[in-house]
Swiss-Prot record:
One of its GO terms (cellular component) is extracellular region. Disulfide bonds join 67-113, 134-143, 136-139. It comes from the Eukaryota. The record marks 100-101 as: Reactive bond. GO terms for molecular function: serine-type endopeptidase inhibitor activity. It is found in: Secreted. The record marks 68-69 as: Reactive bond for trypsin. InterPro entries: Kunitz_inhibitor_STI-like_sf, Prot_inh_API-A/B, Prot_inh_Kunz-lg. This is Proteinase inhibitor A. Residues 1-24 form the signal peptide.
Amino acid sequence: MAASNALLLISGVLLISLAVLCHGDPVVDSDGDAVQLNLGGNYPLYTIQSAAIGFRGGLSTLHKDACKSYVYEAPETDRGLPVGFSASATSQPVMQLGSRYKFSFSMPVPLICDTAWSIGKSTEETGVYKLAACSCEFCKIACPEVGSFNVNGRTLLGIGGEHFTVRFQKFDALAMKTAPQ
């Protein structure tokens, strides 16, 4: 009986230790500020810029039908769609490395459609990140890395493919309206 209690105690300590070790550093945007989550109320939107084209183009979505969309790398002159981030598993106000978040592209879509994209985070260098697609927010399995694929001249994102890194930039609606096209 004492051995099983000791094992239970050691398991509990190990789980707490793993939780502390897995608690990541904050993800930062292009200004060096922590990326803010949507916890209700006012929260900033961001654009996600691809390192492959010098952080000039953003990510956007391409709709196949009413609710199915693909994420793609927009051309250099297109800043992409604004994105908000949320996580049901945290009350932390900022995104942290190694945690899972829903990326919600801000766009007009039918109300029956879910525009959230589940993603995991890992870092390569300060302010530049790799994305990982997760099948669910609370699964215990590792999330595969997101890469890029060239399909008919358009760069789509998916599992595997070419190495793909990004950075986050605060979305400025005024700059989007006045930017030369």
